[in-house]
């Protein structure tokens, strides 16, 4: 909750006001935020987060939220409509911002599992719904021994701001089961997943219009298919939209083409929007474009793999891969397809012959243009941020940078592209899959034939127009003088690129186009906000400001029921 205080502004000069308030409220964080004054106070319980070595994950998200509020609050007050005094507007804005902070619902579930060997154990899981300002809520389910109540709350909060950042109309949620999936058989994992689904359903924590899970760490299409099947055959057996209760499903279960690679492709598009901006590249001392760029990726799972593939295709060079059981380094480049094949065959990247194990202290400190943390949270801290040599950090993982490290990186002119934007490709394409399930038809099915015939009619029309013109007598004489040819047919053939698209966009084409557009539009909005508030390279605060303004508008326009 917020610790709100009423602050009277006395005196004629603004700088004197700020100085007085700063002395009176040393922990209130009354700051100018690069020239933009605010009264918003960061709660005392978060006062150590900006310098903490290992803050709680949820505290990190809360702190970034409050930092965004410091920038946005004054503008939100100015934009308030209605016959209210300024003090009344301030109180309303503070009230709505207060409403946006806490986690709305969180459930802890424990149930027994009878293992294949006959012994029993208890399984613990969580589901958090951070914000229901938009429904359904949306967020993945992860299977990991690191799952905790704090982590699930933090990830659900991050999902709220992530969805708002890229204009996906969902609230934020997250779930986790505290298990290591590698220690269970497929039969045991199916029993765990189906039982967890039933427990969520009984408590109203899953449903097409209520709460829609998705894959996350340790889960994939298989688990999502089990969830959809369990829900459809129990609680949702009369619901025609039952399979929209979860996304990331196999294609024949209502999944969508392009979902598996969506997060990695989103990371690529997000990077592309900033790496081609000469203004940002000049600030960090590099040139625009992919040519000659090197990168290191931490984590070679689904996100890391597809990110590496798309960046390599664009012309960048992967020189290092960090995994939990080993690292690879090759300054000449690592082929992501060959490494993927090796990992699929051996279950690890260790032993891959086309790169050497890194012999230094930590590969993430190696010189490169782009560092991509795509594994777990809090890998860049105040203790190692000064050793990062990359010029760009793309947060493909959730929460990889602590607030203290974030400040160090910005002060060092390192461009941090924040998690709530850069890894939003997954939830964006999940939104497309959810819409597909509600519409009960795949994208493009109704238009494929029409688009193909329309394109051929267009080519025929161009050909007829040209032939009609050249058959004119005056044109014939001119053509005969210049080319020695009169009349005849002039075939109009499609170019190679047009020929590939002439039959109309496939579902994957539509998904890729929609994702590209979403990431581009969101990037422009972040840049615009960063410029508006003079935030420089602080893209994280700009992204949070955008999210806060959108969520605030939803609450403001909907009103409070009670």
From Swiss-Prot:
Transit peptide, residues from-to: 1-53
GO molecular function: ATP binding; glutamate dehydrogenase (NAD+) activity; glutamate dehydrogenase (NADP+) activity; GTP binding; identical protein binding
PROSITE patterns per UniProt: GLFV_DEHYDROGENASE (PS00074)
Tissue: Expressed throughout the embryo during early stages before becoming localized in mesodermal tissue by stage 8. At stage 12 expression is concentrated in the posterior midgut. After stage 13 expression it is found in the anterior and posterior midgut, the hindgut, fat body, muscle, and central nervous system. In 3rd instar larvae expression is found in the leg disks, the wing pouch of the wing disk, the eye-antenna disk, and the developing brain medulla.
Catalytic activity of the protein: L-glutamate + NAD(+) + H2O = 2-oxoglutarate + NH4(+) + NADH + H(+); L-glutamate + NADP(+) + H2O = 2-oxoglutarate + NH4(+) + NADPH + H(+)
Annotated localization: Mitochondrion matrix
SUPFAM superfamilies cross-referenced by the UniProt entry: Aminoacid dehydrogenase-like, N-terminal domain, NAD(P)-binding Rossmann-fold domains
GO cellular component assignments: cytoplasm; cytosol; mitochondrial matrix; mitochondrion
Protein name: Glutamate dehydrogenase, mitochondrial
Species of the source: Drosophila melanogaster (Fruit fly)
